[in-house]
Amino acid sequence: MEPQLLFEGNSPEFDFLGAVKAGFPSPAESIREHLDLSSLLVRHKASTFFFRVDGVSMVEADMDEGDILIVDRALEPYNGCRAVCFLDGEFTVKTVEISENGALLRPANPAYKPIPVGPENNFSVWGVVTWVIKKCTP
């Protein structure tokens, strides 16, 4: 058997991604950049607020009891947004559906009914939910 060239002409170039540990990895060695949670999670500092979820009406929207909601009051509410609303003296978080007849506050749990909102209600969309912070361990 005669030896053959593996590649004819120029050999191809491959990306070199860096070293890979064969022992215990050091998390600090793979840091490429630092993450500032404040700049990631808060667009409008003066109009951003935090709420803790109390209840289970939004569980199918991944808003579970005890989660922290980041709510931005500077954002314009839109049809289908998840928002903290002020309804007849109380705060609630729901999906907001806007129509010519008013609004419908839709829960994300089939055990709860949608809440129709009309001119007789004291109602406002207080702020749009931009992030949900979850705790993954007990």
Model segments located where?
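Structural motif
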Residues: 66-67, 81
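Charged, well-structured alpha/beta interaction segments
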Residues: 60-61, 69-70
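Short, compositionally biased
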Residues: 49, 79-93, 97-103
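Glycine- and charge-enriched low-complexity intrinsically disordered segments
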Residues: 7-8, 12, 98-138
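Short, positionally conserved secondary-structure boundary motifs
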Residues: 1-59, 90-91, 98, 131-138
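Short polar/acidic secondary-structure junctions
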Residues: 42, 74-76
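Residue-level recognition of conserved beta-strand edge/terminus positions
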Residues: 71-72, 86, 132
